[in-house]
Amino acid sequence: MLRDLQETDVKAICDINQETLGYTFSPEDTASQLARLSQDSHHFLLGYEDVTSHVLLGYVHAEVYESLYSKAGFNILALAVSPQTQGQGIGKSLLQGLDQEAKRRGYGFIRLNSADHRLGAHAFYEKVGYTCDKVQKRFIRIF
């Protein structure tokens, strides 16, 4: 079942991020970010909960993508589903929920970046209707 992410999801989010994406971020920092981003209309956070156990099995996090060279859309920052439940339609459901929100807001697209080595993710995105339109490198400056 799709629903908004909640404060009680922090442990599950941390576990999913570690197991699926390889990111370690403390529960305290995750809770702080979740509280802040949940109140920001430029961020959209949607979870998928098991209807029987009420355990969070996956989530999508998107931000508004606006520029001087395109109409507004969503940029997916994270789509993560617990490894034990992948292949059951959870990721597809989360993206359908994101599609609905993008259309409700009048956005023209949803975009995402996916690491070069994540071939399984690439196949999934293509299966659910996304196309690869660019190959690029990411540059970052850390303070």
Predicted regions, residues:
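Hydrophobic adenine-recognition pocket in adenosine-nucleotide-binding enzymes
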Residues: 5, 79-81, 114, 130
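Conserved GNAT acetyl-CoA-binding A-motif
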Residues: 95, 102-114
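Short hydrophobic/aromatic beta-strand or adjacent loop that forms the aromatic wall/cage
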Residues: 42-43, 134-138
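Conserved acetyl-CoA-binding loop-helix of GNAT-fold acetyltransferases
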Residues: 81, 87-100, 123, 127
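Conserved acetyl-CoA-binding loop of GNAT-fold acetyltransferases
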Residues: 126-135
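Acetyl-CoA-dependent GNAT
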Residues: 4-72, 77, 95-96
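Conserved beta-strand-loop-alpha-helix junction that forms the acyl-donor binding cleft
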Residues: 111-121, 140-143
